[in-house]
Amino acid sequence: MPHSAYIFDFDGTLVDSMPYVAMGVKSFLKSRGVDYPENIMEIVTPLGYPGSADYYNEHFGLSTNGEEYLEYVQNLIYKYYQNEVPLKPGVYEYLTALKARGASLAILTASPLRFVRPCFERLGVLNLFDHVWSCDDFSMTKSNPEIYLKAAERFALAPDQIAFFDDSIHSLTAAKAAGLFTVGIYDETAKAFVEQMTKTADVFLEDFRNIDHI
């Protein structure tokens, strides 16, 4: 049944940006001479930029920090968010339908908001959102159930009145623990977790087409 509010992840959920993010991550690691595993994006995506830098230092012997890493990746891929990154199939139609029926919408992302706003302005959807939140606004990651409870407070709603969409098993697990209705979204970079997401999320979808029942 329809909910009162909807929270969406950004990268890999609403926009098909993960190939660009992966390019930036792998370029950074190559520039440091790191022989990274094939599933590096599955490992670091839930960590955010500071957490990813910590992971590289611990596992690859680097001595980088989150700001240095963020600056490198941002400078490399920012232009793609401004000019190329597209919405995933059915996203525009779904978001406009939600607003038409009076739902409140929010973004909750580990990505810098300087990526989100110009991308959504270009795609014509920024004005559909009541809130655009970064994890930094809550001082915690999306792997922490508390962040969803704090978001619910900002909506002045109970958690079970909110639907949450993400392509990350870690975020979906945390949101479900917080009591939100969870919707897993397929993304190529997270395909190894499809079985887990199908079991964990209340609903798992290939894309946003024909989902007006949620």
Task: Describe the role of every protein-language-model region.
Residues 1-4, 96-99, 113, 117-214:
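Asp-based, Mg2+/Mn2+-dependent phosphohydrolase catalytic module
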Residues 2-97, 101:
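N-terminal helical cap/lid subdomain that shapes the substrate entry/recognition surface
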Residues 13, 109-111:
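Conserved phosphate-coupling serine/threonine residues in phosphotransfer and NTP-handling enzymes
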Residues 14, 87, 105, 140, ...:
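Conserved SAM-binding loop
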Residues 35, 104, 181:
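Residue-level detector of anion-binding/catalytic polar loops
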Residues 46, 112-113:
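Short "lid" loop at the C-terminus of a central beta-strand within the Rossmann-like core
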Residues 81-86, 110, 182-184:
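Short, flexible loop segments at the rims of nucleotide/cofactor-binding pockets, characterized by
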